[in-house]
Amino acid sequence: MKIKTIALSFVAVVSLNATTITELFDALDQQPSLQIDELNKQMGQIGKKKVDSNYYPTLNLFGSYTHYNSPTNLLPLDPITAGKLAQTPGKSVPFAQTIQKVGVLVNMPLYVKELGELSQKMKHLAKSAKYKKMLNLYKSQATILGANSGLEYLDNLLVTLNSTKKSVQNTQNDIKISVDNGRMPGIALDKIDQKLNELDININNINIQRLNLIAKIQKLTNIKLKHSVKMNLDTKLQENSIFALKPLEEKLLASKKDLSAVKSKRYSPKVALNVMYSENYAQEDVKLGKSVHEGYGYYQIGISIPLYDKSKSVDIELKKIQLLKDQKNIEKTKDELKADIQSIKEQLKLLDRSALLTKENIKKQKNLLKFAKVAVKEGRMTQEDYLRYEDGLLSANAKYYQVVSKKWQSIAKLTVIYGNNLKGMIK
């Protein structure tokens, strides 16, 4: 969809601290909220590494010192070997009451199906965190854009109010001359004074609203603006896919892998390799009367097949429900976003037309006000009627500024939905 840029014909608002919209977007990267999102992304990546680390062997050294109440064999021997040792001079089946062992133990999974499923689960969760970080960035950018457009609306409304105030003051001076000359009653000035007071009240209320928007931007950027910054739509919106769904889609894929992992844990066998080797020392062998030592070790390939575990069956049911919830959540969010897209696009078309109509209305109100100022000065129009023309021009300008602000806010909403980085779109 091509979005037309509204040409702003009103008085340009100057930022006293010379901050640009790009600088505001850049400042977002340094804020704690987005840094937290970055840490969440890193935690997701490390979570996958943690699961994958289970594929690696574990290596442990061990040692022991054991004293028995009766002589105990140093290591297991088959009967034939034990018989030969007993008959060989200078040899003996090693028995002792005190035995020391030093060795190494290695364990390594050869086949554990659930580890593969869990690794894929963590991969999708890491991607979900990545997309979530990007989405939060786009939301923050859209918030800044919306707040700045609101501030721009109020700034230009202030310009119009001050212009109206100046216009009324000029008329006040003309009426004062007529009152002093006796051509108009003194109450004519009271009506003008009342109008000036109303304008001052409106100006004060707008300044309060401005402070709220300035604070909103400051919370996100740590930059306190004095006025709104200029904005121009540099590139058109890219409508590739609904980016706002990506974190949920990756979370759904993670839920599917989570269910598969629980099923694998319940039904799939596990194969593991275990290796052990130790040096065993016997103090004061029973027969030889001296210390001896022998090496002893084994390797083992073991298989474990789950037959029945009620808790795992319950876990499967819970994971199925969670998966269904995630699916329904995506369907719900997708329907809502599609409705939002359709509504925003229709609004943008209407706002384009409103911008043209309000600009034309401003021209007409300016011409009418010129005639009204002359008429009231010459006494051919009451002060009430003249002030209505001042209000008419003020209202026409306000409606135009409001249309411009609403269009910026609508664009900001679409950029979040479609995942467009405003830093490259708005200059």
Describe each model-derived feature in a short phrase.
Residues 62-105, 275-312:
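Small/polar, glycine/serine/threonine/aspartate-rich low-complexity segments that form flexible
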Residues 23-64:
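Start-of-domain marker
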Residues 67-69, 225, 399-427:
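Acidic, low-complexity, intrinsically disordered peripheral segments
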Residues 35-39, 52, 109-137, 187, ...:
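Sec/SRP-type N-terminal targeting helices
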Residues 22-31, 80-86, 123, 218-276, ...:
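Amphipathic alpha-helical coiled-coil scaffold segments and their short linker/junction regions
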Residues 179-183, 376-382:
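A short glycine-centered flexible hinge/capping loop motif at secondary-structure junctions
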Residues 46, 133-246, 251-253, 344-347, ...:
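Periplasmic alpha-helical coiled-coil/stalk elements that build and connect Gram-negative outer-membrane
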